[in-house]
Regions:
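Non-heme Fe(II)/2-oxoglutarate
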Residues: 1-98
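Catalytic core of non-heme Fe(II) oxygenases with the double-stranded beta-helix
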Residues: 74-84, 88-198
């Protein structure tokens, strides 16, 4: 189990063949069980939970497991099965015999011509109070660092605990109550797989 405030960064978390399979399905032309991977447009990737504060950063997303406010999310996509081995490896690394997926999704962000390159809004992924672990997997090398803060709730100011640069095969596993965010990519696409487990 991960400790309070703990962050683990592990390169080559899965073997290169599996890394390339995920990459080729999500941002390439490979199919999974004869299905092409569908992406869904969102007006602003920085808006969460009905917030009115928008940074106008369109992106693409794909939900795998939908969070229903209970101890187990509902599977929303056939593509969730693609990530079961990754989640099993995370459970093993955490010393847990099994984990429950509360929420799972991917995001694909593009370089944008923005006037303001402030970081995305700091947030936690689940707001209902479930203790959870974030498993964030980077599909490809990119800019657009993940920034994890020391703070565990909304604050006027934030202090950086750790920055992590996206790199294919890298995973970041951390205490889900740590506020975190992402920088907008400037030079490359930024593609992540983001699961919340307990």
């Amino acid at each position: 189990m991960i400790q309070e405030n703990e962050i683990m960064v592990i390169d080559d978390f899965i073997d290169i063949e599996y890394q390339n399979q995920i990459k080729n399905i999500l941002i390439g032309e490979e199919t999974f069980k004869d299905y092409e991977f569908p992406w869904y447009y969102v007006d602003d990737v920085t808006v969460a939970y009905g917030e009115s504060d928008t940074q106008h950063r369109p992106a693409l997303t794909h939900p795998y497991v939908y969070y229903e406010g209970t101890s187990l999310g509902s599977i929303d996509s056939e593509f969730h099965k693609l990530f079961v081995p990754l989640l099993q490896r995370a459970a093993f690394k955490l010393g847990m015999p099994y984990v429950n997926a509360l929420q799972g999704r991917s995001f694909l962000q593009f370089p944008l011509n923005l006037k303001n390159y402030d970081v995305d809004n700091p947030h936690i992924d689940l707001v209902e109070g479930h203790k959870h672990i974030v498993v964030l997997y980077y599909v490809c090398d990119s800019d657009g660092d993940t920034i994890i803060y020391n703070e565990r709730k909304e604050s006027e100011t934030y202090t950086i605990k750790q920055r992590v640069t996206p790199k294919q095969g890298r995973v970041v596993i951390f205490d889900g109550w740590l506020m975190h965010t992402a920088e907008q990519p400037i030079n490359n696409i930024r593609c992540v797989v983001n699961y919340n487990l307990n």
